[in-house]
């Protein structure tokens, strides 16, 4: 799947530059995790395995990077549940994933060790993390009967 590059695509929603760290450890993710409105000011600093967090009006605290990563995956898995998967019945397997609410469609191509998608989220996961799975990939995994990308990879490596 060929991806076009747009130099403005790595801008976060607030106009700041997205980086390897802010892609997963973002203030937006923190607000979702804590159930805070988007208007609440937060400050974050990255350390080895935790994120120092200060929410206006509260004492500073630490949030585990593992919690951010879990939120990153679970959010995409949840969003995948409302998507519709169409199997092209080709080799290698191709799928069209449609969002019924918006009508948007994305192409997902299955490989033994990954699912490639033409969406922006997958593109940035590849660039910043080196691997990944977007909500469209998780929709295909659910369609194929897998709970996680790791289960899918293991099944393919074991020849199931």
Residues of each region from the PLM?
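Long, low-complexity, compositionally biased intrinsically disordered regions
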Residues: 2-160
């Amino acid at each position: 799947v060929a991806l076009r590059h747009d130099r403005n695509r790595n801008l976060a929603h607030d106009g700041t530059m997205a980086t390897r760290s802010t892609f997963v450890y973002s203030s937006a993710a923190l607000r979702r995790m804590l159930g805070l409105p988007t208007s609440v000011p937060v400050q974050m600093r990255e350390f080895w395995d935790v994120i120092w967090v200060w929410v206006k009006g509260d004492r500073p605290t630490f949030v585990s990077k593992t919690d951010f990563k879990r939120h990153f995956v679970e959010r995409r898995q949840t969003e995948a549940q409302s998507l519709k998967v169409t199997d092209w019945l080709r080799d290698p397997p191709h799928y069209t994933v449609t969002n019924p609410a918006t009508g948007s469609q994305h192409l997902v191509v299955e490989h033994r060790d990954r699912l490639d998608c033409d969406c922006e989220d997958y593109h940035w996961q590849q660039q910043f993390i080196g691997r990944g799975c977007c909500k469209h990939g998780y929709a295909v995994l659910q369609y194929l009967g897998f709970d996680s990308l790791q289960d899918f990879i293991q099944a393919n490596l074991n020849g199931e």
